[in-house]
Amino acid sequence: MRHLHHQTSQTKLWAVIPAAGSGSRFSKTELKQYQYIQDATVIEHTVKRLSQLPLTGYVLAIGKQDTFASTLSFQDKHKAHFCNGGVERVHSVLNALNYLSQIADEDDWVLVHDAARPCVTFECLNTLVKNAIETNQSAILAIPVRDTLKQVNQEQQIDKTVSRELLWQAQTPQIAKIGILKKAIETALKNNLTITDEASALESIGESVQVVMGRSDNIKITYPDDLELARLILQSQN
Protein backbone atom coordinates (compact mmCIF):
# COMPACT_ATOMS: atom_id res chain seq x y z
CA MET A 1 0.00 0.00 0.00
CA ARG A 2 1.24 3.47 -0.79
CA HIS A 3 1.94 5.46 2.30
CA LEU A 4 0.88 8.98 2.94
CA HIS A 5 4.08 10.94 3.28
CA HIS A 6 4.18 12.22 -0.31
CA GLN A 7 0.45 12.98 -0.33
CA THR A 8 0.52 15.11 2.78
CA SER A 9 3.41 17.40 1.83
CA GLN A 10 0.91 20.19 1.13
CA THR A 11 -1.91 18.72 3.19
CA LYS A 12 -1.52 19.27 6.90
CA LEU A 13 -2.87 16.57 9.16
CA TRP A 14 -3.72 17.07 12.83
CA ALA A 15 -5.18 14.82 15.50
CA VAL A 16 -7.57 15.59 18.35
CA ILE A 17 -7.84 13.23 21.31
CA PRO A 18 -10.70 13.99 23.71
CA ALA A 19 -9.42 12.77 27.09
CA ALA A 20 -11.42 14.71 29.67
CA GLY A 21 -14.05 12.03 30.29
CA SER A 22 -14.36 10.37 33.66
CA GLY A 23 -15.06 6.93 32.21
CA SER A 24 -18.24 6.28 34.19
CA ARG A 25 -17.76 2.50 34.13
CA PHE A 26 -14.40 2.78 35.87
CA SER A 27 -14.24 3.90 39.51
CA LYS A 28 -14.05 7.66 40.05
CA THR A 29 -10.37 7.52 41.00
CA GLU A 30 -9.42 5.59 37.88
CA LEU A 31 -9.57 7.29 34.50
CA LYS A 32 -9.50 4.60 31.84
CA GLN A 33 -7.04 6.51 29.64
CA TYR A 34 -4.50 6.48 32.49
CA GLN A 35 -4.62 2.77 33.22
CA TYR A 36 -1.40 0.96 32.41
CA ILE A 37 -0.94 -1.70 29.76
CA GLN A 38 2.55 -3.09 30.21
CA ASP A 39 4.78 -0.07 30.86
CA ALA A 40 2.69 2.72 29.32
CA THR A 41 -0.73 4.25 29.87
CA VAL A 42 -3.59 3.61 27.46
CA ILE A 43 -3.37 7.18 26.14
CA GLU A 44 0.38 6.88 25.50
CA HIS A 45 -0.27 3.74 23.43
CA THR A 46 -3.01 5.64 21.56
CA VAL A 47 -0.77 8.62 20.77
CA LYS A 48 2.01 6.26 19.66
CA ARG A 49 -0.34 4.67 17.12
CA LEU A 50 -1.53 8.03 15.76
CA SER A 51 2.06 9.29 15.57
CA GLN A 52 2.78 6.70 12.87
CA LEU A 53 1.01 9.17 10.57
CA PRO A 54 2.82 12.33 9.40
CA LEU A 55 0.97 14.55 11.89
CA THR A 56 1.72 18.27 12.07
CA GLY A 57 0.59 18.11 15.69
CA TYR A 58 -1.99 16.67 18.05
CA VAL A 59 -4.25 18.23 20.69
CA LEU A 60 -5.19 16.46 23.91
CA ALA A 61 -8.38 17.87 25.45
CA ILE A 62 -7.98 17.10 29.14
CA GLY A 63 -9.85 17.79 32.37
CA LYS A 64 -9.26 21.17 34.04
CA GLN A 65 -7.80 19.48 37.14
CA ASP A 66 -5.63 17.08 35.11
CA THR A 67 -1.97 17.54 36.04
CA PHE A 68 -1.00 14.01 35.02
CA ALA A 69 -1.27 14.15 31.22
CA SER A 70 1.56 16.66 30.77
CA THR A 71 3.97 14.42 32.71
CA LEU A 72 3.55 11.45 30.36
CA SER A 73 6.12 10.35 27.77
CA PHE A 74 4.12 10.93 24.62
CA GLN A 75 5.55 10.04 21.22
CA ASP A 76 6.75 13.19 19.39
CA LYS A 77 6.02 15.23 22.51
CA HIS A 78 7.16 18.40 20.72
CA LYS A 79 4.00 18.03 18.59
CA ALA A 80 1.71 17.77 21.64
CA HIS A 81 -0.72 20.56 22.50
CA PHE A 82 -3.09 20.63 25.47
CA CYS A 83 -6.44 22.35 25.93
CA ASN A 84 -9.25 22.12 28.47
CA GLY A 85 -11.89 19.53 27.78
CA GLY A 86 -15.60 20.13 28.19
CA VAL A 87 -18.58 18.64 29.99
CA GLU A 88 -19.07 15.96 27.33
CA ARG A 89 -16.95 14.52 24.56
CA VAL A 90 -18.47 16.82 21.93
CA HIS A 91 -17.52 19.91 23.96
CA SER A 92 -13.96 18.61 24.36
CA VAL A 93 -13.69 18.12 20.60
CA LEU A 94 -15.04 21.61 19.93
CA ASN A 95 -12.59 23.14 22.43
CA ALA A 96 -9.74 21.35 20.65
CA LEU A 97 -10.98 22.56 17.25
CA ASN A 98 -11.18 26.13 18.58
CA TYR A 99 -7.60 25.74 19.80
CA LEU A 100 -6.52 24.33 16.43
CA SER A 101 -8.19 27.10 14.47
CA GLN A 102 -5.64 29.52 15.97
CA ILE A 103 -2.64 27.55 14.67
CA ALA A 104 -4.00 25.61 11.68
CA ASP A 105 -5.81 26.33 8.42
CA GLU A 106 -9.52 25.54 8.23
CA ASP A 107 -8.81 23.34 5.19
CA ASP A 108 -6.31 21.22 7.12
CA TRP A 109 -7.53 17.73 7.95
CA VAL A 110 -8.17 16.60 11.52
CA LEU A 111 -8.53 13.07 12.87
CA VAL A 112 -10.60 12.76 16.04
CA HIS A 113 -9.74 9.61 17.95
CA ASP A 114 -10.90 8.17 21.28
CA ALA A 115 -8.21 8.21 23.97
CA ALA A 116 -9.28 4.69 24.95
CA ARG A 117 -8.72 3.08 21.51
CA PRO A 118 -5.04 2.11 21.67
CA CYS A 119 -5.26 -0.83 19.24
CA VAL A 120 -5.97 0.96 15.93
CA THR A 121 -3.52 -0.26 13.28
CA PHE A 122 -1.34 1.82 10.97
CA GLU A 123 -2.96 0.13 7.95
CA CYS A 124 -6.41 1.34 9.04
CA LEU A 125 -5.13 4.84 9.81
CA ASN A 126 -3.32 5.07 6.50
CA THR A 127 -6.30 3.83 4.47
CA LEU A 128 -8.69 6.22 6.24
CA VAL A 129 -6.56 9.32 5.65
CA LYS A 130 -5.71 8.32 2.08
CA ASN A 131 -9.41 7.84 1.23
CA ALA A 132 -10.41 11.18 2.76
CA ILE A 133 -7.69 13.12 0.95
CA GLU A 134 -8.17 11.39 -2.42
CA THR A 135 -11.97 11.82 -2.41
CA ASN A 136 -11.86 15.18 -0.56
CA GLN A 137 -14.55 13.83 1.75
CA SER A 138 -15.02 13.24 5.49
CA ALA A 139 -14.66 9.60 6.54
CA ILE A 140 -14.78 7.27 9.52
CA LEU A 141 -13.50 3.81 10.34
CA ALA A 142 -16.39 1.38 10.80
CA ILE A 143 -17.16 -2.32 10.62
CA PRO A 144 -20.35 -4.07 9.44
CA VAL A 145 -22.55 -5.25 12.30
CA ARG A 146 -22.11 -9.01 12.53
CA ASP A 147 -24.38 -9.96 15.45
CA THR A 148 -28.15 -10.32 15.30
CA LEU A 149 -29.73 -7.15 16.70
CA LYS A 150 -32.89 -7.12 18.81
CA GLN A 151 -35.13 -4.18 19.57
CA VAL A 152 -36.52 -4.59 23.10
CA ASN A 153 -39.17 -2.85 25.18
CA GLN A 154 -38.75 -1.38 28.67
CA GLU A 155 -39.46 -4.77 30.25
CA GLN A 156 -36.46 -6.19 28.37
CA GLN A 157 -38.75 -8.25 26.15
CA ILE A 158 -37.92 -8.54 22.45
CA ASP A 159 -40.15 -6.47 20.17
CA LYS A 160 -38.48 -7.42 16.91
CA THR A 161 -35.29 -8.41 15.15
CA VAL A 162 -33.62 -5.51 13.37
CA SER A 163 -32.15 -6.10 9.91
CA ARG A 164 -28.39 -5.60 10.11
CA GLU A 165 -27.91 -5.57 6.33
CA LEU A 166 -27.04 -1.87 6.07
CA LEU A 167 -25.84 -1.32 9.64
CA TRP A 168 -22.23 -0.49 10.44
CA GLN A 169 -20.64 0.03 13.83
CA ALA A 170 -18.81 3.37 13.94
CA GLN A 171 -15.27 3.50 15.30
CA THR A 172 -12.62 6.19 15.45
CA PRO A 173 -10.62 7.91 14.08
CA GLN A 174 -13.11 10.07 12.21
CA ILE A 175 -11.59 12.56 9.78
CA ALA A 176 -12.84 15.86 8.36
CA LYS A 177 -11.56 19.31 7.49
CA ILE A 178 -11.16 21.49 10.58
CA GLY A 179 -13.48 24.28 9.39
CA ILE A 180 -16.29 21.94 8.28
CA LEU A 181 -16.21 19.87 11.48
CA LYS A 182 -16.13 22.96 13.70
CA LYS A 183 -19.14 24.43 11.87
CA ALA A 184 -21.01 21.10 12.06
CA ILE A 185 -20.52 20.75 15.83
CA GLU A 186 -21.38 24.39 16.55
CA THR A 187 -24.57 24.11 14.45
CA ALA A 188 -25.59 20.82 16.07
CA LEU A 189 -25.09 22.18 19.60
CA LYS A 190 -27.04 25.34 18.74
CA ASN A 191 -29.91 23.11 17.57
CA ASN A 192 -29.71 20.96 20.73
CA LEU A 193 -28.97 17.80 18.75
CA THR A 194 -27.48 14.77 20.49
CA ILE A 195 -23.99 14.32 19.07
CA THR A 196 -22.36 10.99 19.86
CA ASP A 197 -19.54 11.23 17.33
CA GLU A 198 -18.14 13.60 14.69
CA ALA A 199 -20.04 11.89 11.86
CA SER A 200 -23.39 12.58 13.54
CA ALA A 201 -22.54 16.30 13.61
CA LEU A 202 -21.44 16.22 9.96
CA GLU A 203 -24.59 14.32 8.91
CA SER A 204 -26.74 16.95 10.61
CA ILE A 205 -25.49 19.68 8.25
CA GLY A 206 -25.79 17.45 5.17
CA GLU A 207 -22.08 16.72 4.87
CA SER A 208 -21.31 13.40 3.13
CA VAL A 209 -19.34 10.94 5.24
CA GLN A 210 -17.86 7.72 3.84
CA VAL A 211 -17.21 4.58 5.85
CA VAL A 212 -13.81 2.95 5.54
CA MET A 213 -13.50 -0.68 6.61
CA GLY A 214 -11.92 -0.92 10.05
CA ARG A 215 -11.01 -3.95 12.13
CA SER A 216 -12.81 -5.61 15.02
CA ASP A 217 -9.67 -5.39 17.18
CA ASN A 218 -9.91 -1.57 17.24
CA ILE A 219 -11.71 -1.85 20.58
CA LYS A 220 -12.71 0.98 22.87
CA ILE A 221 -11.74 0.31 26.47
CA THR A 222 -15.01 0.76 28.33
CA TYR A 223 -15.04 -1.78 31.16
CA PRO A 224 -12.14 -2.76 33.45
CA ASP A 225 -11.82 -6.22 31.86
CA ASP A 226 -11.30 -4.59 28.44
CA LEU A 227 -7.78 -3.66 29.62
CA GLU A 228 -6.69 -7.29 29.53
CA LEU A 229 -8.24 -7.72 26.07
CA ALA A 230 -6.40 -4.61 24.82
CA ARG A 231 -3.15 -5.95 26.27
CA LEU A 232 -3.59 -9.23 24.39
CA ILE A 233 -4.46 -7.41 21.14
CA LEU A 234 -1.42 -5.11 21.39
CA GLN A 235 0.77 -8.12 22.13
CA SER A 236 -0.56 -10.04 19.11
CA GLN A 237 -0.21 -7.00 16.81
CA ASN A 238 3.41 -6.50 17.81
Swiss-Prot record:
Site positions per UniProt: Transition state stabilizer: 25, 32
EC number: 2.7.7.60
GO terms, molecular function: 2-C-methyl-D-erythritol 4-phosphate cytidylyltransferase activity
Record's keyword terms, sorted: Isoprene biosynthesis, Nucleotidyltransferase, Transferase
Reactions it catalyzes: 2-C-methyl-D-erythritol 4-phosphate + CTP + H(+) = 4-CDP-2-C-methyl-D-erythritol + diphosphate
Pathway: Isoprenoid biosynthesis; isopentenyl diphosphate biosynthesis via DXP pathway; isopentenyl diphosphate from 1-deoxy-D-xylulose 5-phosphate: step 2/6
Family matches, as InterPro entries: IspD, IspD/TarI, IspD/TarI_cytidylyltransf_bact, ISPD_synthase_CS, Nucleotide-diphossugar_trans
A GO biological process held by the record: isopentenyl diphosphate biosynthetic process, methylerythritol 4-phosphate pathway
Site (Positions MEP for the nucleophilic attack): 164, 220
Keyword Nucleotidyltransferase: yes
Purpose of the protein: Catalyzes the formation of 4-diphosphocytidyl-2-C-methyl-D-erythritol from CTP and 2-C-methyl-D-erythritol 4-phosphate (MEP).
Similarity remark: Belongs to the IspD/TarI cytidylyltransferase family. IspD subfamily.
NCBIfam families the record matches: ispD
The name this protein goes by in its record: 2-C-methyl-D-erythritol 4-phosphate cytidylyltransferase
Organism in which the protein naturally occurs: Acinetobacter baumannii (strain AYE)
Gene assigned in the entry: ispD
